[in-house]
């Protein structure tokens, strides 16, 4: 029995032994880490531990006991020093953040809707403070600046200053106190619904009006409003203050209106960040961003921010699957189910505004010329229904014929149809392997016919012919004519100079001059017909005005021998006076007017230097005599460099009557000016 016991015991002992001695250290084998088997290994060196081979059981066991050896004591002391150092750094960071936070908080009122339970209040304040610090570092300007240019900078920095805290941010009481009272808010919203929203109608006015009542009920009950709703309403208030500074509805003047606009845009920016509008977009945050991009930012001269905002809105719309609203799967889900048609129509309006804007911008000069981001075959969205907001019914059968009396959505639908033509022009240029300026003339005439067809088929109130029943006081009805006139001008402009020399292209010259003169007349009518709304602040009105004046100047300079020279000068001066009246409220008008003066002034100086005694006015001007860079027409595909530096702080305010239009300029110099100007401000 003893022999059998010893034999079995030996077999068990043999089976329990590993096939080879472990070569990893004790720490790596215990923690199941990959050991590089260099004693000390990298894991132990990083943790400042004693590295002991696993085969040395006795020394490894001593490491498991607290205070078992001097190496363990040294390791604990070093770890304590590291922890103390980290605590000191954290304390210094908290001190810096707390100083910044105390400057922003109002000591008289409640500081936040968030309590300090669980450290959440500190997390919110730290995130907000870091947000402000990062914005200041990014913009290199003090955050308390109240200039209107700060509006664009706020939204530029908002894309790099969003911090993801442990909980969702809230809007503190001092920020909420910047909002107008309920009575003032209702007045501002009524002005927005009457005067502003008609230009780009992608919201549902009754829904936003109900939203206003809900938000102010929450504020009166000391509750935190929904952030995306607050962002949209703050944007509405800001736009009403911006465009209604001359309105009799409001007591504030121009300077106070700018201050209020900046204040409420700042609230909207904070609400958008609190709503996490990039990661978690909603219909309301999309509407807020598009309103700011469409109405405000371009007029302040920040086209790069406009492109960023529109791109972010497009990404948000894709996240919400707005491009598949009417896909077969979604249509099947809506069958025999309760459908919120107001929500469906609002999403259609947002998507088609983004798509039409994308296609129109692709038709204009600039970095986006000839390319668009939204492909029509990659979306399944019906056009918005031609219906007034209050007529949207639960049954879904509320569409109105487009030829009948116009509704809230009529212009938006017509604008979308025009954008489809623009997209097809871009596709035609791509298929032909040429630039838009090089389209065959028969293709240009075909698209010209289609644009005129849209105007002819539009409701009578949108037409400008004498037989139409348009009311002169309803300036928004002129939106369609302005858009088509600028499109025809852009389409025929490459043939403007040739139209005076070759009868084949005389139609293009006639179209350019006729549309330019009609735009100037419409701008005069719009600025004088409605004192409640400052049209000079709409960049989509100032841009066609500048293009029209530039076409008249170009035609005069290239064809000075033609009769009625005094009349042609007079209409040019009239256009300049309109631009001069706009430049105080429009950076676009100021920039365009200064560029035009610089062009004429430089060319006149070159002509006088060439022959100061006899005043030679020969049209044959050497390329080097102009102050503008000359461009080879064969290499028109390369981007045009800047024409000249714009000195905004010192504009040329010489009297218009002293401007010299008898200058020697060629077609390429005007094309450079068109490209430079439209590259900064594409029309849509």
Curated annotation (Swiss-Prot):
The keyword S-adenosyl-L-methionine does not apply. It is found in: Nucleus. The lineage of its organism: Eukaryota, Fungi, Dikarya, Ascomycota, Pezizomycotina. This is Agnestins biosynthesis cluster transcription factor AgnL11. Residues 25-51 bind DNA. Keywords: Coiled coil, DNA-binding, Metal-binding, Nucleus, Transcription, Transcription regulation, Zinc. Residues 606-619 have a biased composition (Basic and acidic residues). One of its GO terms (molecular function) is DNA-binding transcription factor activity, RNA polymerase II-specific. Residues 76-103 form a coiled coil. InterPro entries: Sec_Metabolite_Reg, Transcription_factor_dom_fun, Zn2-C6_fun-type_DNA-bd_sf, Zn2Cys6_DnaBD. One of its GO terms (biological process) is DNA-templated transcription. Transcription factor that regulates the expression of the gene cluster that mediates the biosynthesis of agnestins, dihydroxy-xanthone metabolites. It comes from Paecilomyces divaricatus (Penicillium divaricatum). Residues 601-644 are annotated as: Disordered. CDD domains: fungal_TF_MHR, GAL4. One of its GO terms (cellular component) is nucleus. Its main location: nucleus.
